[in-house]
């Protein structure tokens, strides 16, 4: 099977922004495998049965999912067994350099470790997700998303997440039973499916994506 293009996304996050928050209901997943240079914290609810692809990791997710993805790490979701009813997503993107002047300070040590572990994707425990849900919603529902208060909220959220001792670093493993048992083709088949189905929907109006090769 040939190599699959990975779309290079230009996010709406500008050099003048500290971070970007997006929340949206979803009726399914059809965005292709993509990569961008910003860190991304992605929260999903009511998406049990969907597949999460981060780097070379392929996993079927539960009804709650929260993952931190470092910049430059390819990622995507696929419907798989998800009934796609009432899916809700919160996505937070921030520059890798946001905490550069602070990250080596003692108070930020756990956050630094968390960011390092996010290079292959970092999934948080269900207990942590249940404890942080309200803070994520408060951040995403604020009518002044650029406020300094929201920046402090983001720092608090990241600090709390960095203390999750049950957080799990993703590895190059396919844990989806009966999805694709061929180790050689498992990733290529999933990624090619996402890519080809997206190409059927793409229009000339989309200008912010440039294919790069894995």
Identify the residue ranges that each predicted region occupies.
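Generic protein-terminus/edge-of-domain signal
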Residues: 1-66, 73-76, 108
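A hydrophobic/aromatic-rich effector-binding and dimerization subdomain
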Residues: 2-13, 73-135, 166-167
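A generic fold-level signal
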Residues: 13-16, 36, 61, 84-86, ...
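Residue-level recognition of the GNAT/N-acetyltransferase active site
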Residues: 55, 95, 195
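Short, Lys/Arg-enriched, Trp-marked, Pro/Gly-tolerant hinge/linker segments that flank
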Residues: 122-128, 141-206, 210
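Recognition helix of helix-turn-helix DNA-binding domains
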Residues: 212-214
């Amino acid at each position: 099977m040939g190599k699959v293009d990975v779309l290079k996304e230009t996010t709406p996050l500008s050099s003048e922004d500290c971070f970007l928050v997006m929340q949206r209901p979803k009726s399914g997943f059809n965005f292709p495998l993509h990569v961008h240079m910003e860190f991304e914290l992605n929260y999903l609810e009511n998406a049990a049965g969907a597949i999460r692809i981060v780097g070379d990791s392929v996993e079927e997710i539960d009804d709650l999912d929260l993952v931190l993805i470092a910049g430059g790490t390819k990622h995507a979701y696929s419907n798989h067994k998800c009934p796609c009813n009432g899916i809700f997503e919160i996505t937070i993107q921030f520059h890798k350099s946001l905490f550069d002047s602070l990250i080596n300070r003692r108070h930020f040590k756990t956050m630094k470790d968390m960011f390092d572990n996010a290079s292959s994707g970092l999934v948080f425990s269900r207990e942590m997700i249940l404890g942080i849900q309200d803070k994520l919603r408060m951040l995403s529902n604020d009518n002044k998303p650029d406020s300094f208060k929201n920046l402090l909220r983001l720092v608090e959220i990241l600090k709390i997440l960095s203390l999750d001792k049950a957080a799990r670093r993703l590895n190059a493993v396919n844990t989806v039973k009966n999805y694709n048992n061929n180790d050689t083709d498992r990733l290529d088949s999933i990624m090619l499916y996402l890519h080809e189905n997206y190409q059927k929907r793409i229009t000339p109006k989309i200008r912010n994506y440039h294919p790069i090769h894995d």
